[in-house]
Amino acid sequence: MEKKRRARINVSLEQLRSLLERHYSHQIRKRKLEKADILELSVKYMRSLQNSLQGLWPVPSGVDYPSGFQGGLRGVSQRLRPGEGDSGLRCPLLLQRREGSTTDSANPQATSVLNPCLPAIWAPSRAAGGSHSPQSPLPLPGGLLESSTDVVAPHPASNCQAESTRPGFRVWRPW
């Protein structure tokens, strides 16, 4: 057991020596390095590497999170905003979302009009007399069709809003 451990140590020291010879070739000059010399040169190299990298990657703090989030949101917004000559596959992001928080409770005015790219849950809206709008088939998974009267409209939560995007339909949005 002890022989295997010593063999592993010697193999690792030999690898370190060959790496250090490449880096410190002007200082070593073909002399035989002892184990202590190899370890000292390794420590010296690691310290110089640590000092050279210290200013490159500062430790992130929680203060930078909001500005980083808003910067990322601006970049995503620019990528998703339709431009000239686009095929129309992109959709616009809210300018209000770029300004504020990710929670609607922070700024209730920022949720005036939403145009998300995600699919919506469609449900029939009620007309003035309490009757349903005209029936239209809804596509279901597996290619099944079902009448829209069988779909129950979800009840919006207190901070959710329903948008009217097509006549006779309400769209439930979780924000």
Swiss-Prot record:
Q: Where is the composition biased (Low complexity)?
A: 129-148
Which Pfam families is this protein grouped with? HLH
Q: Which GO terms describe its biological process?
A: hindbrain morphogenesis; in utero embryonic development; midbrain development; midbrain-hindbrain boundary morphogenesis; negative regulation of transcription by RNA polymerase II; neural tube development; oculomotor nerve development; positive regulation of transcription by RNA polymerase II
Keywords attached to this Swiss-Prot or TrEMBL record, sorted alphabetically, are: DNA-binding, Nucleus, Repressor, Transcription, Transcription regulation
Looking at the record, the residues that make up the Orange domain are 65-98
Q: What's in the GO CC field?
A: nucleus
Give the residue ranges of motif WRPW motif. 172-175
Q: Which residues form the bHLH domain?
A: 1-49
Q: Where is this region: Disordered?
A: 126-166
What GO MF terms are annotated? DNA-binding transcription repressor activity, RNA polymerase II-specific; protein dimerization activity; RNA polymerase II cis-regulatory region sequence-specific DNA binding
Q: Where in the cell is it found?
A: Nucleus
- What top-level branch of life does the organism fall under? Eukaryota
Q: How does it assemble?
A: Transcription repression requires formation of a complex with a corepressor protein of the Groucho/TLE family.
Q: What is known of its domains?
A: Has a particular type of basic domain (presence of a helix-interrupting proline) that binds to the N-box (CACNAG), rather than the canonical E-box (CANNTG).
Function of this protein? Transcriptional repressor of genes that require a bHLH protein for their transcription.
Protein name per Swiss-Prot or TrEMBL: Transcription factor HES-3
Annotated organism of origin: Mus musculus
